[in-house]
């Protein structure tokens, strides 16, 4: 009954940085050709969303944030053949068009249809599907899930198992897949190896689960919040360190603990100082360090190139290296078969209108993953 019509619904709008989310009534236009309108039923709160509200990631405002979600297709635009109303889906902030070089390359996944590097905050035709009080509202990295309804391109949607619990599998839209894949797919952690994970939030804990699944024998969690250590050990960390308790730089401590450096390190925070520390703590000839945390937009990194000359590998990881549209349904199937643990990451489930409380839990380190339900 709503197909082809403008839908009025609730959304949390970011009007300006360093201000709380404002819940407003918005208008959501019908999907255009090759677009899908989705009724969002659950969305996770991710640190990347908070980076925007804090001003660390520059985005065009006003904007509807949110990118880790699950919902049901409400209607489809002209030419959409792979999805139909009623399908359970996960929106994808890394699309998969299947035609560009990263999509065609077996080791690529950052489809050129993404809106990550130089975000326009608009759909492919250069317009928005959201309005509020007569103003256009920008989209966030092609997803925008802090709203009851959103519109995404069909290349940025994965259909999933109709029996999947959306308030759990929404984490596959970002946090879990990003961390788990960084270990098993991008770093290709080997059995018996030693790993260090900097940052024990939802993505860092997912990285720990990936290291464990890959057969790492020693997994060292690093965080300045000791309250996260018990959960990290529950999910696979063999030991945890608070750098504030160390008399030496953390990279020196890790090098001494491991007899010369770890095999794999993961920076899952998004800070320049921890990125260089994670690189330095790797074994200098064959260690691999992976940047998983979103780096601050305006900062530059300085390091001694000898750290790479000796043989270390330094690489980045976006969405865990997964080809999104084909991999997300498989990860959901793995959850349904109890091969992966999402429940252990979710510490809070809140109604959507408590979004500001959810972000406060994140900022104060009291949550791992909070999920908002509609």
From Swiss-Prot:
UniProt keyword Oxidoreductase present: yes
Binding site for Zn(2+) 1: 46, 67, 174
Compartment(s) where it occurs, according to its Swiss-Prot or TrEMBL record: Cytoplasm
Modified residue annotations for N-acetylserine: 1
GO MF annotation, one: zinc ion binding
Any single biological process term in GO: retinol metabolic process
InterPro entries recorded: ADH-like_C, ADH-like_N, ADH_Zn_CS, GroES-like_sf, NAD(P)-bd_dom_sf, PKS_ER
Record-listed Zn(2+) 2 binding positions: 97, 100, 103, 111
SMART domains according to UniProt: PKS_ER
Cofactor note: Binds 2 Zn(2+) ions per subunit.
EC number assigned by the record: 1.1.1.1
Top-level taxon of the source organism: Eukaryota
Residue positions binding NAD(+): 199-204, 223, 228, 292-294, 369
UniProt name for this protein: Alcohol dehydrogenase 1
């Amino acid at each position: 009954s709503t197909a082809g019509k403008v839908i009025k619904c609730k959304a949390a709008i970011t009007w300006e940085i360093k201000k709380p989310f404002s819940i407003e009534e918005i208008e959501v236009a019908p999907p255009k050709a090759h677009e899908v309108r989705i009724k969002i039923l659950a969305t996770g709160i991710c640190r990347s969303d908070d980076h925007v509200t804090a001003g660390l990631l520059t985005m065009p405002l006003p904007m509807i944030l949110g990118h880790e979600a699950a919902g049901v297709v409400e209607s489809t635009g002209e030419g959409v053949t792979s999805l139909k109303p009623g399908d359970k889906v996960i929106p994808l902030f890394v699309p998969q068009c299947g035609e560009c070089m990263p999509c065609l390359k077996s080791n690529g996944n950052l489809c050129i249809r993404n809106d990550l590097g130089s975000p326009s905050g608009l759909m492919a035709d250069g317009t928005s599907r959201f309005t509020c009080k007569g103003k256009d509202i920008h989209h966030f990295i092609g997803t925008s899930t802090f709203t009851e309804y959103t519109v995404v391109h069909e290349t940025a949607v994965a259909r999933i198992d109709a029996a999947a619990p959306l308030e759990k599998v929404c984490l596959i839209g970002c946090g879990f897949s990003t961390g788990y894949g960084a270990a098993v797919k991008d770093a290709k952690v080997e059995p018996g190896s030693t790993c260090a994970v900097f940052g024990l939030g939802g993505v860092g804990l997912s990285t720990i689960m990936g290291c464990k699944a890959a057969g790492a024998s020693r997994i060292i969690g690093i965080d300045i919040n000791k309250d996260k250590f018990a959960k990290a050990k529950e999910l696979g960390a063999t030991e945890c360190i608070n750098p504030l308790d160390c008399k030496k730089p953390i990279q020196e401590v890790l090098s001494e603990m491991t007899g010369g450096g770890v095999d794999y390190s993961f920076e899952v925070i998004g800070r320049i100082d921890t990125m260089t520390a994670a690189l330095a703590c790797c074994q200098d000839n064959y260690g691999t360090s992976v940047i998983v945390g979103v780096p601050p937009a305006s900062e530059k990194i300085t390091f001694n190139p000898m750290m790479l000359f000796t043989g270390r590998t330094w690489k980045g990881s976006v969405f865990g290296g997964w080809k999104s549209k084909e991999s997300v349904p498989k990860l959901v199937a793995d959850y349904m078969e109890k091969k992966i643990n999402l429940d252990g990451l979710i510490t809070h489930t809140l109604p959507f209108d408590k979004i500001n409380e959810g972000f406060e839990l994140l900022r104060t380190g009291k949550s791992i993953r909070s999920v908002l339900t509609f």
